[in-house]
């Protein structure tokens, strides 16, 4: 009786007695073993542990096979160098080759039985499970000579059960090759199916178990293991085989069987009558076809299916080697796309026109959160789960297939909360739902309250320019933070700073800020708005009132701002956000004696000071009060490619005066900044890959319509404006335009770069009250060019001031763009 269809099942079974099923009108001993992927998809350095693959019709043997397949995949992935640090945390999981086997086998022959046999399991699972034969590690250097005449063939049954045999040679002999048979080379995928290794030491029972595994795995029509006595006392082994072959197929179907329940099994009784056997096989056929119809289609794209069909058309019949190549090809696509838990667990409908490839894709069934203390003990966390859960990408939620890219994104998103010192995202098999994946997220929370004190010392020159003991001034900053209030990621941050703690009233500055995220509720994931309010007192040196390059140094003017700010930030995407709010502040201008300063001043040739400079405030009294609306739109698509910033960034800011305050100020200030980082050599992103060559293009425009106090005029010159000039050295104006270009060339894991920059006031300096650009003899425009090198966080640059034609060396911290 010929069978209409057959199936190959791959289960994580240890080698055991071979099972025989009736197929093709004869009794067939089915056996198969799995090979590692030939596409380098297995994690580097991961040991290829053996998995036995056997045919079975027992439901008990098939139960849990899909869970085992996923466990094997996750184990291999976790050992595959895909541990991603995130604030000290890591991401368990990675890509591997055929990451274990098992899973999904169901019937005895799957609707036709025979040939491929039965119970659930994994065709390739022997790579990661306990294998049939392992070298005795304790006695690997202590083995027994065979004690037989040299160069005679020795059946395994004739070996002594008391000896440990050293294997010096392993060969494969294909009986069907070339008509009379031929030895195959290491490139043959069958080489990877055995666990025996030359140089290993094995007992007779281990060798017999290896043979039984090969016999029972379904890959061979016939297989035998024979030894040859070597003169040095070792054994050479030859595996002679005839691979299994099925009829030609013209169609290929891929289904996801990950969460499908196991079918009820009925043992195939060899004592059945012919009619009972026929009824049994028909029932298996109906059950399997119903299973195929009820399965979800796999996510394998059409072009990969077409490639598999092309592989099938090149061969007249479906062979075990062809199925290995199909398995490798399918799993390679899954693993390359980040679906590291996907496993090919079965090929069904063999001996028909359509081959069915069953895949356990790694469906996520649930997400679990675990909090740990500093010692790794599980504790009750302070952070509310919805705060973390809303940061998970959609692809990492139940109902989706586990993907390592989604795991990386989850790490990045959760880390952006700044609530945890350690984050781990680990997939594991679901023990309650066979074939499912549980995403396990382990978190270590930061201390909610913290305080910090930092000190600094400054020396003020005394008489005759020499410092004295009394001129030493202690300064410092006291800061505190209470984060994650009520577990809702709300926080209060404060700091107090003074450069002279002996007389802190001279320059005491402070900031107190409250942040309230999820303004529309934690559960509303369609909106992400954060409310922030702060009160502040700051002091900065104004670059508006500085002397030009051909003047003596002008007396400095300090700008104090004390006020209140409240705004709402709405995140449209992780790259785009919109901030809008209200600012109320009092601005006071002071001279170096801390007295209120109403006008700028400059040194006269006589040594005196000219006090008729531009007014420092809009009111002319040295004190302004105003309220204005402020909005900011940021679109940042930059990313790090091997340590270099690539992408584009756009920032638009608008300040709108309300006519409230000193002299009823009404104005519109606007700024637009565009920066693009171009990957010139299209360097791909990846660990260990070199830095890309980068071209930076930058432009900045700012303008003001309406009332414009001098302290808010736009200045030209400085390390973040036009390099090579001092802060404000080129001018202060109502409108400015800056353009810059920088070419970065990677040299030994750092950058050497050249740049050119230009800035102009567009002729608007005269429109600033008192014209500080003219008063301080500045030109209103300037260019520079130079070369630089990055030394860690420091930029060393040689810059030519194009206005004066002189060059200067600068060292700066941070980035220009």
UniProtKB/Swiss-Prot annotation:
Main location: plastid
GO cellular component, one term: chloroplast outer membrane
Membrane topology (Chloroplast intermembrane): 136-147, 174-232, 262-364, 426-434, 460-471, 517-561, 586-692, 723-784, 814-817
Entry keywords, A to Z: Chloroplast, Membrane, Plastid, Plastid outer membrane, Protein transport, Transit peptide, Transmembrane, Transmembrane beta strand, Transport
Spans annotated as Disordered: 14-59
GO biological process: chloroplast organization; protein import into chloroplast stroma
UniProt keyword Transit peptide present: yes
Transmembrane segments: 148-156, 165-173, 233-241, 255-261, 365-372, 418-425, 435-443, 450-459, 472-480, 508-516, 562-569, 578-585, 693-701, 714-722, 785-791, 806-813
Entry-linked Pfam families: Omp85, POTRA1_3_Toc75, POTRA2_Toc75
Amino acid composition bias (Low complexity), ranges on this chain: 26-38
Alphabetical list of InterPro entries matching this protein: Bac_surfAg_D15, D15-like
Membrane side Cytoplasmic: residue ranges: 157-164, 242-254, 373-417, 444-449, 481-507, 570-577, 702-713, 792-805
Coiled-coil features, chain-numbered ranges: none
Transit peptide region: 1-31, 32-135
Mode of membrane association: Multi-pass membrane protein
Subcellular location: Plastid, Chloroplast outer membrane
Keyword check for Mitochondrion: no
Protein family (similarity comment): Belongs to the TOC75 family.
Domain notes: Transmembrane regions consist mainly of membrane-spanning sided beta-sheets, which are not predicted by sequence analysis tools.
PANTHER family: BACTERIAL SURFACE ANTIGEN (D15) DOMAIN-CONTAINING PROTEIN, SORTING AND ASSEMBLY MACHINERY SAMM50 PROTEIN FAMILY MEMBER
Its job: Mediates the insertion of proteins targeted to the outer membrane of chloroplasts. Required for the import of protein precursors into chloroplasts. Forms the voltage-dependent preprotein translocation channels (hydrophilic beta barrel) of the TOC complex in the chloroplastic outer membrane.
Oligomer status and interactors: Part of the TOC core complex that includes a protein for the specific recognition of transit peptides surrounded by a ring composed of four proteins forming translocation channels, and four to five GTP-binding proteins providing energy. This core complex can interact with components of the TIC complex to form a larger import complex. Chloroplastic protein precursors also interact with these complexes.
Protein name, as recorded: Protein TOC75, chloroplastic
Organism of provenance: Oryza sativa subsp. japonica (Rice)
Lineage: Eukaryota, Viridiplantae, Streptophyta, Embryophyta, Tracheophyta
């Amino acid at each position: 009786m010929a069978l209409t269809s057959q199936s190959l099942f791959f289960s994580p079974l240890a080698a055991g007695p071979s099972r025989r099923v009736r197929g093709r009108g004869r009794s067939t001993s089915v056996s198969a073993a799995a090979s590692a992927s030939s596409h380098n998809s297995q994690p580097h350095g991961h040991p290829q542990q053996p998995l036995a693959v056997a045919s079975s019709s027992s439901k008990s043997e098939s139960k849990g096979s899909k869970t085992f397949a996923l466990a094997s995949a996750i184990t291999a992935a976790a050992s595959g160098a895909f541990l991603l640090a995130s604030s000290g945390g890591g991401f368990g999981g990675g890509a591997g080759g055929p990451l274990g086997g098992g899973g999904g086998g169901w019937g005895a022959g799957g609707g036709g039985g025979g040939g491929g046999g039965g119970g659930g399991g994994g065709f390739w699972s022997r790579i990661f499970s306990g294998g049939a034969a392992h070298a005795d590690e304790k006695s690997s250097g202590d083995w027994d000579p065979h004690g037989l005449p040299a160069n005679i063939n020795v059946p395994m049954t004739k070996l002594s059960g008391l000896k440990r045999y050293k294997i010096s040679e392993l060969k494969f002999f294909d009986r069907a090759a070339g008509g009379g048979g031929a030895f195959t080379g290491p490139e043959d995928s069958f080489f990877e199916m055995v666990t025996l290794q030359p140089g290993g030491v094995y007992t007779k029972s281990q060798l017999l178990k290896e043979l039984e595994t090969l016999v029972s795995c379904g890959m061979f029509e016939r297989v035998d293991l024979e030894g040859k006595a070597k003169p040095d006392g070792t054994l050479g082994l030859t595996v002679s085989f005839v691979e299994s072959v099925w009829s030609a197929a013209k169609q290929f179907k891929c289904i996801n069987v990950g969460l499908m329940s196991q079918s009820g099994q009925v043992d195939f009784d060899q004592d059945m009558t012919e009619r009972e056997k026929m009824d049994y096989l028909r029932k298996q056929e109906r059950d399997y076809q119903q299973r195929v119809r009820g399965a979800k289609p796999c996510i394998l794209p059409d072009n990969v299916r077409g490639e598999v069909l092309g592989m099938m058309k090149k061969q007249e019949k479906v062979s075990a080697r062809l199925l290995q190549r199909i398995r490798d090809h399918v799993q390679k696509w899954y693993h390359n796309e980040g679906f590291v838990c996907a496993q090919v667990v079965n090929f069904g409908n063999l001996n028909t026109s359509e081959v069915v490839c069953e895949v356990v894709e790694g469906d996520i069934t649930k997400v679990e959160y675990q909090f740990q203390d500093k010692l790794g003990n599980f504790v009750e966390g302070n952070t509310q789960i919805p705060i973390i859960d809303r940061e998970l990408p959609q692809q990492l939620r139940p109902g989706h297939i586990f993907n390592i890219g989604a795991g990386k994104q989850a790490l990045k998103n959760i880390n952006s909360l700044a609530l945890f010192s350690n984050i781990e995202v680990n997939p594991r098999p679901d023990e309650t739902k066979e074939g499912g994946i549980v995403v396990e997220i382990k978190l270590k929370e930061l201390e909610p309250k913290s305080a910090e004190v930092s000190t600094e010392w400054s020396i003020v020159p005394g008489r005759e320019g020499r410092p004295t003991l009394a001129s030493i001034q202690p300064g410092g900053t006291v800061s505190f933070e209470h984060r994650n209030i009520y577990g809702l990621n709300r926080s209060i941050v404060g700091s107090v700073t003074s450069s002279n703690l002996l007389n802190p009233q001279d320059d005491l500055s402070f900031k107190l800020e409250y942040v309230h995220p999820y303004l529309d509720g934690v559960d509303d994931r369609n909106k992400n708005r954060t409310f922030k309010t702060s009160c502040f007192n700051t002091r900065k040196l104004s670059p508006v009132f500085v002397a030009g390059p051909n003047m003596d140094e002008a007396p400095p003017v300090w700008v104090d701002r004390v006020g209140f700010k409240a705004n709402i930030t709405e995140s449209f995407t992780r790259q785009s956000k919109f901030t809008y709010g209200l600012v109320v502040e009092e601005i006071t201008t002071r001279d170096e004696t801390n007295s209120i300063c109403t006008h700028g001043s400059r040194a006269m040739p006589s040594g005196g000071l000219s006090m008729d400079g531009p007014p420092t405030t809009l009111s002319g009294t040295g004190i302004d009060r105003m309220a204005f609306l402020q909005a900011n739109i940021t679109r940042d698509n930059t990313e790090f490619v091997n340590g270099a910033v690539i992408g584009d960034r756009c920032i638009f800011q608008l300040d709108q005066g309300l006519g409230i305050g000193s002299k009823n100020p009404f104005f519109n200030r606007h700024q637009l900044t565009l920066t693009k980082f171009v990957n010139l050599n299209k360097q791909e992103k990846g660990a260990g890959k070199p830095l890309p060559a980068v071209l930076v293009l930058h432009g900045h425009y700012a303008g003001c319509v309406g009332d414009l106090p001098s302290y808010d005029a736009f200045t030209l010159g400085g390390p973040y404006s036009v390099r090579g000039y001092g802060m404000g050295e080129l001018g202060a104006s109502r409108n400015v335009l800056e353009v810059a270009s920088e070419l970065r060339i990677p040299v030994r894991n750092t950058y050497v770069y050249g740049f050119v920059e230009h800035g102009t006031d567009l002729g608007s300096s005269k429109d600033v009250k008192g014209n500080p650009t003219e008063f301080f003899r500045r030109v209103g425009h300037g260019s520079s060019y130079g070369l630089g090198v990055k030394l860690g966080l420091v930029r060393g640059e040689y810059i030519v001031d194009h206005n004066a034609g002189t060059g200067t060396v600068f060292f700066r911290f941070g980035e220009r763009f």
